[in-house]
A protein has these predicted regions:
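N-terminal membrane topogenic signal
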Residues: 7-19, 87-92
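Sequence termini and other peripheral, non-core segments
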Residues: 1-11, 23-30, 119, 139-151
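Phenylalanine-focused residue identity feature
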Residues: 11, 44-45, 66, 80, ...
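N-terminal first transmembrane alpha-helix
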Residues: 12-18, 24, 28, 43-49, ...
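Membrane-interfacial, low-structure loops and terminal tails that flank and connect transmembrane helices
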Residues: 2-9, 73-88
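A structural feature that tracks compact, well-ordered secondary-structure segments
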Residues: 32-64, 71, 106-143, 147
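Hydrophobic core of alpha-helical transmembrane segments in multi-pass integral membrane proteins
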Residues: 20-30, 95-107
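Alpha-helical transmembrane segments
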Residues: 16-20, 52-56, 92-96, 128
Length: 151
C-alpha cells in the first residue's frame, strides 16, 4: 500500500507541471462555457484558454518532441536510426506544430469568427503561430545573456 502511494505521489510529482497546467486550462474552459463572452470576464476566460493551451503545448511538446538547432528544444538522444526517421525525429516539434496548427486553422475557417468559440479558436491559432515562430527563430537568432543562446 505504501509503495503504491509513493509511486502515485512520484508520478504526480514528476508530472505536476503538465497536470496543473491541464487543470487550469480545464477551469478556464469550464468558466468560459458558462460566461457571456461580451463581458470583460467572459472575454478574459476566452483569452486565457488560448494562452493556457499554448502553455500546455509548450510544456508537453518540448518534453517529448525535438527541434534540431532550436535553443528552446531539448537535445535528441544519440542512437542509430534511418536518416528519414532521424530527420522526422530531429524536427518533430516543428512538424507537430505545423500539423496541429493547420488543424486549428481549418477549424477556425469553419467557425464564425465572431462566435463565442470562434474567437477562442482564433486566439489559439495566434498562439500556435507564436510558438512555431519562437521555435524557428531560436534556431537562428540569439539573445545576449540568455542561457538558451549560450548553447
Amino acid at each position: 500500500m505504501a509503495e503504491t502511494r509513493t509511486r502515485r505521489r512520484s508520478f504526480i510529482r514528476q508530472h505536476s507541471l503538465s497536470i496543473t497546467s491541464a487543470a487550469v486550462l480545464a477551469l478556464w474552459i469550464y468558466l468560459y462555457s458558462r460566461s457571456n463572452p461580451s463581458t470583460h470576464i467572459g472575454s478574459f476566460f476566452g483569452n486565457a484558454i488560448a494562452d493556457w493551451t499554448g502553455l500546455l503545448v509548450m510544456v508537453l511538446a518540448t518534453k517529448y518532441l525535438f527541434e534540431r538547432g532550436s535553443a528552446e528544444s531539448r537535445r535528441p538522444p544519440k542512437n542509430f536510426m534511418g536518416s528519414a526517421l532521424q530527420r522526422l525525429r530531429d524536427h518533430s516539434l516543428t512538424i507537430f506544430l505545423l500539423v496541429t496548427g493547420l488543424g486549428w486553422v481549418f477549424l477556425y475557417a469553419s467557425l464564425d469568427s465572431e462566435s463565442k468559440w470562434g474567437q477562442v479558436v482564433g486566439n489559439i491559432v495566434s498562439e500556435w503561430t507564436q510558438i512555431l515562430g519562437l521555435v524557428l527563430m531560436t534556431k537562428i537568432l540569439i539573445e545576449r545573456h540568455s542561457k538558451e543562446s549560450n548553447r
